[in-house]
Amino acid sequence: MLSSSGHAIRRGITTSAALSNKHAFIVGAARTPIGSFRSSLSSVTAPELASVAIKAALERGAVKPSSIQEVFLGQVCQANAGQAPARQAALGAGLDLSVAVTTVNKVCSSGLKAIILAAQQIQTGHQDFAIGGGMESMSQVPFYVQRGEIPYGGFQVIDGIVKDGLTDAYDKVHMGNCGEKTSKEMGITRKDQDEYAINSYKKSAKAWENGNIGPEVVPVNVKSKKGVTIVDKDEEFTKVNFDKFTSLRTVFQKDGTITAANASTLNDGAAAVIVASQEAVSEQSLKPLARILAYGDAATHPLDFAVAPTLMFPKILERAGVKQSDVAQWEVNEAFSCVPLAFIKKLGVDPSLVNPHGGAVSIGHPIGMSGARLITHLVHTLKSGQIGVAAICNGGGGSSGMVIQKL
């Protein structure tokens, strides 16, 4: 067990602006709808979902598939997805056989870290076109049986989602218990989290109604024996029951604050972001959507993962050359409602600028995809000249963040 003493833990922070004179531009971004657990997208594999997102990002950015030189895709639960899942997605999207592909696992930060890696390849001059994104089919994550002799009394079946995605590897507790620790230490109540989550659901519904989310989404054709079903909308925000919201029992601790309603859900989806150099943008007469100003990672004690995103700021903003007051929109992943609430409380961020169109609580949290969804959403909702920030925590006490400017 790791010590929770502030003196015993080294808080690591890494940030970066451009690593050379090269700028990294986002020229295309798209995502699939997010399906509920074992629901509309459950028969589609994670690589297949990512292929759909990559194709859409290429088409919308007017980028030729043959231009892509490297791909980074996040995925957390890779068991039974087949060899090199990101490679499957790249080839499934029609990219060249010569494209270099890497699957990234930084738990919930995987999708955003993949975009950071793509940006670094552009900034250092290694590539002119790269894709960063994330994918997850939590519906298809298998159960595990330990290899070896079967003991007397049978064997235990292990849930792959819980084991590899939702359990702290050091203290052997569910991530929700870590969230409860943060809630208690920061005075974030059950009422605070319920109110936040209810607003998240309402904001997501309104955003879909007003056309704030639709433009970033590409429909997925789901084949079955009955034919083809077109899934073109997020599912999770439509399934809320506000009448039962505040009466649900807490999930992780008897006297706790986190419930099934004010936490994120298990979901399926994928997102892809195309990053290009200034030279490539000029040569192909592309219209860039945004410029990547800075990014970074931070880490603290694994039990305190919920506050890890706050450790990156204001350092990343300083590297980007902007002030906190310059940020028009903060996309902070809602693994649990206490995460954005802690972010707002610690940094003094204007709550109205945080997740204005809802977040993972109401939209869904396919864990390998979510970081890429944050950037995809910012690219499509910021107005020209505005600054946007994406921040996401991850198991093990880590986090990743990025600052972009809409062009």
Swiss-Prot record:
Summary of the knockout phenotype: Animals have a shortened lifespan and exhibit early behavioral decline characterized by the premature onset of uncoordinated locomotion and paralysis.
Primary localization: mitochondrion
Domain of life (superkingdom): Eukaryota
Keywords, in A-Z order: Acyltransferase, Metal-binding, Mitochondrion, Potassium, Transferase, Transit peptide
InterPro entries: Thiolase, Thiolase-like, Thiolase_acyl_enz_int_AS, Thiolase_C, Thiolase_CS, Thiolase_N
Alphabetical list of PROSITE patterns matching this protein: THIOLASE_1, THIOLASE_2
Compartments, record wording: Mitochondrion
GO cellular component terms given for this protein: mitochondrion
Residues that bind CoA: 201, 244, 264
Pfam families: Thiolase_C, Thiolase_N
Positions bound to K(+): 201, 260-261, 263, 361
SUPFAM superfamilies: Thiolase-like
Broad EC category: transferase
GO MF, any single term: acetyl-CoA C-acetyltransferase activity
Family named by the database record: Belongs to the thiolase-like superfamily. Thiolase family.
NCBIfam families, per database record: AcCoA-C-Actrans
Function description: Plays a role in ketone body metabolism. Has an effect on lysosome related organelles (LRO) function, in a pathway with serotonin. Acts downstream of sir-2.1 to regulate aging and stress resistance.
Name of this chain's protein: Acetyl-CoA acetyltransferase homolog, mitochondrial
Species in which this protein is naturally found: Caenorhabditis elegans
